[in-house]
C-alpha cells in the first residue's frame, strides 16, 4: 500500500499519523508526529499459537538519545538497558492494550515504540500509546480496540489536557487515563490530596479526549486497515471439565475456602498434582503404516485441558463465593480489611524504620537521609540535568511467598510498584528548603498475599515519620477489587492474591485523611462504568481512613529530632555573585574550608543556596558562620568591629594619613585621617598600629565596590 497521511489536533498541537511508508514488514506500523515529537510504533504477532497458559504480550517503549540531539554516556556510547522511565512507560501502554485481546489468545505479540524525535512540550508517552493502538488497529492482529490515552492536569480548579512540564509544576493533579470510546480501562495518577469527586471529574475529562482520538483512529482503520485473522483460541472442553470435576472438583472447591494462604495453596496444589497424575495414565493411540503408535498431540491436548479445567474450577468457586454468598475465600466480608499490626524503630542504626503487617502481607520500611549531591540523576531526553531527591525502592524477594527464585536487578513489576509508592508519598514531603536532604525509602516485602505495593506506602509513611521527616500528613494505601457477574458486581476492599488473580480489577488508592495522593487502576475486562468507579473510590476512602487510624496508634506525629546516626544539614543563602568567593580558583577556598571544618560536606546551588552537612551540629554552625563571613557585603550606615591591616602613609612615607581596616574576612575599607576623630589632626603617628581593633561606620561604597569607613562617626 502507498503512504497515507491523517491529521488532527490534540490539546492545541498538530497531530499527524503516517502509515504505509516505514516498517512495512511489520503486521502494523505508524509514524506519529505530535508537535516536534516523532514516534515509530510497530506491532508484530507470531502466526503460530504459543504453548503458554498466559497471553505473551510484550510492549516496549524506547527513547533514543539522538531524539534529543544527545550522545549516550558510558564507555560504549550507545543505549543500554531500559531506563526507569522507559520501563514505566512500557507498562503504562501495556495495561490498556492487554484487556482488548480475547481471553484465550496465545499468539506472541510485540508492540514496539521508538522515540525518534523529542519535543519537551509534546508528550512522547501519549504519542506512543496512540501509535501502539493504531499499529494494532491497522494490522491483521485480532485486537478489539482502539484505545487512546489522555494526560490531565488541574490548575486553579481548571482541567488541562496534556499539560506542559511547567504547567505540571503548579498542577494539583498529574493523571494519565486510557480506555476505549465506551469505557476507561487504565488510570495512573498522582495528586496533592484531592477529593474523590475531583479525581473522578478529571478521569471523565480525560475520557472526552479519548473518545475523539478513538474516532480519529476509526477513520485511519477504514482507510488503511486490513482484515483481522480469526484467532485460534484456547477454549474449554466441557466434557473434560465435567470429568475433572467429577474426580476431584468438590475437594478443590472446599480447599478454596481455607483461610490460611499457604495451607490453601498447598492443598490446592496437592489436589491438582493428584488430578494431573490420574489423567497422565491415559494414553491415545493412532495407526501409522498399519502399526499402533502413541498419539502424543492428543495426549498433550488432554493434559492442557485438564490444567485449564482445574484453574477454571478454582476461578468459578472464588467468584461464586463473592457474588452469591457475599463472602471471600478467607471468610471476610466484601468491605472488610485484614487484621493490622505495625511497629517502628526496629533497626537501631538506620535513620528510620517501620514494620507494617496486613493479614499475610508484610513490609519492612527503611529511610536513609543524605546530602543533596546524592540525589538521583535522571539521564533522559531532557537537555538539562534532571535530579530526584526522593527515591522509593521496592524489593520483592522470593522468600516472601515461600519460594526460591532469581535474585538480581529489579524487574518491571518491582520498578512499577516502587514508582507507585514514590508518587503516593512524594505529595506530602516537605520542600527542599524546609528539609534539605536526599531521601531514600526502601520497602522490603517479607511476606506477601496481595496488596504489597499498598503495604509499601503505609510502611514508608511510618518510617518517614520515625526518621523525623516532617511530612504534611500520614499516607495509607488500599487495593480494591471487582467481580463482575453480568450486570451485577461486587467491590472488594483490601484484596488478597487469589482475589487479584481471579478478579476483574485491581484498583489501588493511596492518600491522607484529606484526599488522594496516588491512584492506579488496571482491569481485565474491557472497561468499567463511572458508577462502579465512583463506588470503588468511596469504599476505598473508608478503608483508607480505617488503616490511617491504626497507623496513628503506632506513630501519630513526626519525630522532632533526627536519628543520632543521621547527618545534620544546615542551609544558608548567599548572593549568587559571591559563589566564586566561596569556591575559589580551582576550588581552593572550598577545599580549605572543608579541611578546616572537620570534613564537612558542602553543596552550593546556582541560586545561592548553600547546604552544609555533618553529624555534629557545632561544626555546621562554625562552617555556616565562616562562609557567611566570606560573602558578607558591607552596608552603608552599619557599624563594624574592624581590624587594622595596613597603614596609609603620606607621599614622603613619614606620616600616617589613614588606615585600611578589615570589617570582615575579604572586605576592607579606608579610614582617612579626616574621618579618624572629631578634632582635626595632622598625623595618626602613635595613635594606631597594625592589628588594632577599631569601631567603624560604613559611610560610602563607590561603583567599584570600594568602601569608605569613618571612625569618628562611630564614636
Swiss-Prot record:
Cofactor(s) it depends on: Mg(2+)
Residues binding Mg(2+): 500, 506
Chief location of this protein within or outside the cell: cytoplasm
GO MF entries: 3'-5'-RNA exonuclease activity; magnesium ion binding; polyribonucleotide nucleotidyltransferase activity; RNA binding
Alphabetical GO biological process terms: mRNA catabolic process; RNA processing
Family of the protein in this entry: Belongs to the polyribonucleotide nucleotidyltransferase family.
Function text: Involved in mRNA degradation. Catalyzes the phosphorolysis of single-stranded polyribonucleotides processively in the 3'- to 5'-direction.
Name used for this protein in its record: Polyribonucleotide nucleotidyltransferase
Species this protein is from: Acholeplasma laidlawii (strain PG-8A)
Phylogenetic lineage: Bacteria, Bacillati, Mycoplasmatota, Mollicutes, Acholeplasmatales
Amino acid at each position: 500500500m502507498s503512504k497515507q497521511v491523517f491529521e488532527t489536533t490534540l490539546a492545541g498541537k498538530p497531530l499527524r499519523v503516517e502509515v504505509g511508508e516505514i516498517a512495512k514488514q511489520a503486521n502494523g506500523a505508524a509514524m506519529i508526529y505530535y508537535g516536534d515529537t516523532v514516534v515509530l510504533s510497530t506491532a508484530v504477532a507470531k502466526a503460530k499459537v504459543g504453548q503458554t497458559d498466559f497471553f505473551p504480550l510484550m510492549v516496549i517503549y524506547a527513547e533514543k538519545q539522538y531524539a534529543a540531539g544527545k550522545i549516550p554516556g558510558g564507555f560504549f556510547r550507545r543505549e543500554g538497558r531500559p531506563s526507569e522511565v522507559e520501563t514505566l512507560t512500557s507498562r503504562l501502554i501495556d495495561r490498556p492494550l492487554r484487556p482488548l485481546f480475547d481471553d484465550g489468545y496465545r499468539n506472541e505479540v510485540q508492540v514496539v515504540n521508538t522515540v525518534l524525535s523529542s519535543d519537551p512540550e509534546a508528550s512522547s508517552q501519549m504519542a506512543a500509546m496512540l501509535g501502539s493502538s493504531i499499529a494494532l488497529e491497522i494490522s491483521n492482529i485480532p485486537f478489539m480496540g482502539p484505545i487512546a490515552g489522555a494526560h490531565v492536569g488541574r490548575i486553579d480548579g481548571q482541567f488541562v489536557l496534556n499539560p506542559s512540564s511547567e504547567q505540571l509544576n503548579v498542577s494539583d493533579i498529574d493523571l494519565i487515563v486510557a480506555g476505549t470510546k465506551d469505557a476507561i480501562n487504565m488510570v495512573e495518577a498522582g495528586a496533592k490530596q484531592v477529593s474523590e469527586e475531583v479525581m473522578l471529574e478529571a478521569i471523565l475529562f480525560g475520557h472526552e479526549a479519548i473518545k475523539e482520538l478513538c474516532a480519529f483512529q476509526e477513520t485511519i482503520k477504514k482507510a488503511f486497515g486490513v482484515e483481522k485473522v480469526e484467532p485460534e483460541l484456547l477454549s474449554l472442553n466441557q466434557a473434560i471439565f465435567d470429568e475433572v470435576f467429577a474426580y476431584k472438583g468438590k475437594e478443590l472447591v472446599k480447599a478454596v475456602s481455607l483461610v490460611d494462604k499457604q495451607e490453601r495453596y498447598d492443598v490446592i496444589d496437592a489436589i491438582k498434582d493428584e488430578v494431573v497424575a490420574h489423567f497422565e495414565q491415559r494414553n491415545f493411540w493412532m495407526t501409522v503404516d498399519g502399526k499402533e503408535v502413541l498419539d502424543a498431540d492428543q495426549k498433550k491436548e488432554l493434559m492442557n485441558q485438564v490444567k485449564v479445567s482445574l484453574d477454571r474450577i478454582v476461578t468459578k468457586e472464588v467468584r461464586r463465593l463473592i457474588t452469591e454468598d457475599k463472602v471471600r475465600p478467607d471468610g471476610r466480608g466484601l468491605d472488610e480489611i485484614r487484621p493490622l499490626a505495625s511497629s517502628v524503630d526496629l533497626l537501631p542504626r538506620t535513620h528510620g524504620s517501620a514494620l507494617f503487617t496486613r493479614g499475610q502481607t508484610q513490609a519492612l520500611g527503611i529511610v536513609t537521609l543524605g546530602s543533596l549531591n546524592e540525589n538521583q540523576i535522571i539521564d533522559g531526553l531532557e537537555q538539562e540535568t534532571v535530579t530526584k531527591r526522593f527515591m522509593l525502592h521496592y524489593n520483592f524477594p522470593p522468600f516472601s511467598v515461600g519460594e526460591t527464585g532469581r535474585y538480581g536487578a529489579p524487574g518491571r513489576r518491582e520498578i512499577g510498584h516502587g514508582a507507585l509508592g514514590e508518587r503516593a508519598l512524594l505529595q506530602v514531603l516537605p520542600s527542599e528548603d524546609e528539609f534539605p536532604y536526599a531521601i531514600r525509602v526502601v520497602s522490603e516485602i517479607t511476606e506477601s498475599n496481595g496488596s504489597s505495593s499498598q503495604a509499601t506506602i503505609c510502611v514508608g509513611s511510618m518510617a518517614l515519620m520515625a526518621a523525623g521527616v516532617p511530612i504534611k500528613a500520614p499516607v495509607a494505601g488500599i487495593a480494591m477489587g471487582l467481580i463482575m457477574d453480568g450486570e451485577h458486581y461486587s467491590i472488594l476492599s483490601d484484596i488478597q492474591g487469589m482475589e487479584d488473580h481471579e478478579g476483574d480489577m485491581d484498583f489501588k488508592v493511596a492518600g491522607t485523611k484529606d484526599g488522594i495522593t496516588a491512584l492506579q487502576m488496571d482491569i481485565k475486562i474491557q472497561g468499567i462504568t463511572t458508577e462502579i468507579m465512583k463506588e470503588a473510590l468511596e469504599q476505598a476512602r473508608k478503608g483508607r481512613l480505617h488503616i490511617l487510624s491504626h497507623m496513628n496508634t503506632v506513630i501519630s506525629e513526626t519525630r522532632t529530632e533526627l536519628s543520632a546516626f543521621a547527618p545534620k544539614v544546615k542551609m544558608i543563602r548567599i548572593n549568587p555573585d559571591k559563589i566564586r568567593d566561596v569556591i575559589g580558583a580551582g576550588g581552593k577556598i572550598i577545599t580549605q574550608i572543608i579541611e578546616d571544618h572537620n570534613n564537612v560536606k558542602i553543596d552550593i546551588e546556582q541560586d545561592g543556596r548553600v547546604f552544609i552537612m555533618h553529624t555534629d551540629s557545632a561544626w555546621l554552625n562554625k562552617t555556616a558562620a565562616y562562609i557567611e563571613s566570606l560573602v558578607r557585603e558591607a552596608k552603608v550606615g552599619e557599624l563594624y568591629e574592624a581590624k587594622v591591616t595596613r597603614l596609609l602613609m603620606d607621599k614622603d612615607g613619614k606620616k600616617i594619613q589613614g588606615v585600611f581596616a578589615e570589617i570582615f574576612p575579604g572586605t576592607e575599607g579606608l579610614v582617612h585621617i579626616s574621618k579618624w576623630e572629631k578634632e582635626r589632626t595632622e598625623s595618626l603617628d602613635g595613635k594606631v598600629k597594625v592589628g588594632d581593633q577599631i569601631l567603624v561606620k560604613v559611610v560610602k561604597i563607590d561603583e567599584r565596590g570600594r568602601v569608605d569607613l569613618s571612625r569618628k562617626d562611630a564614636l
